[in-house]
Amino acid sequence: MAVQLCFQEEEATVHLRRFSCKGSADCPDLSHSAGLLESFLCGTPARDYVYQSVPYETQIQQAAQAIADADCVLIGAGAGMSAAAGAQYGGDFFEKNFGEFQRKYGNDPYMQDMYSAGFYPYPNEESYWGYWSKQAVLGGIKLDVTPLHRKLLDGLSGKDIFVLSTNADGQFVKAGLPQKNIFCIQGDYFHIQCAHACHDRTYDATAMFLQMDQARRDCKIPTYMVPRCPVCGGSMDMNLRKDGYFVQDSAWYEAERCFGDFVSRSLDRKLVLLELGVGFNTPTIIRFPFEKLTREHDNITLVRLNLDQAVIPESLGNRAIGINADMAESISDILNVSVSHPYPAQER
């Protein structure tokens, strides 16, 4: 049995829907790691959130010391990390790069940024892929590695690290972190799948998106370029968790296994949960689980960086640090501050 995750944020609970994989090689039975992920995910928010009344410089010193003392670091990266690194989705960027879509479809509420435009009810598949191919190219394929991602990984060099990310831009791979150290639980901009999940496999669409980007006219791609499912002959879709048909393929389950292994071996070591730009859009994946782990294990320190949502459960005391400031500056300050090193960092 494989596990598909379905989230209902209104009730702040996590629901799991199981479906048979029919024993396919693309969807192995990983019930142990699935159980770990299920126990990790948490839909319960804290009841005692506070903005910590501690000077910024003190928080930076505390965060830097916690990371220096840690054996391992689990990074939880949300949309705020990409934004802090310079990624742009709306405003002048959207108008400049997607102005033709705004003119064609009008000043629709959907046509305000790259997030909302993905949910626009495009009239046909030529138009649908006309939009999504451009978003994939600009938001992932041609997006250079950001200095912030590179600086972060360089600053954690020598630590045992793993990244759990809800971002689709592939930045941590581009920054040099091995794929085995990354779990992109929500999918990415580089793969497509059967729109109705008739089989458990995804397909690298990088080359296809680049070709679509060149062939697009009047916001549409030629009909012959519309991808079809090689199994059922039906429509294809982005491999992004946006509905109940998200495909979790063998690579997804391998990433889940690596994540589970990292968490298991880290629970009896000094572990820092470094949460970067995670808000309340999908808090059941990173924010709430990080709080739950910190509550349950005295050896864990939570470091939460966010522009304006770095509230911390007061009950976590000095094992949680919430830095409410420009995240790029906070990361730079943490990595640059002088700290004591009680013992050498372990090799990754």
Regions found by a protein language model. Give the residues of each.
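Conserved catalytic alpha/beta core of Sir2/sirtuin-type deacylases, generalized to analogous enzyme cores
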Residues: A2-R348
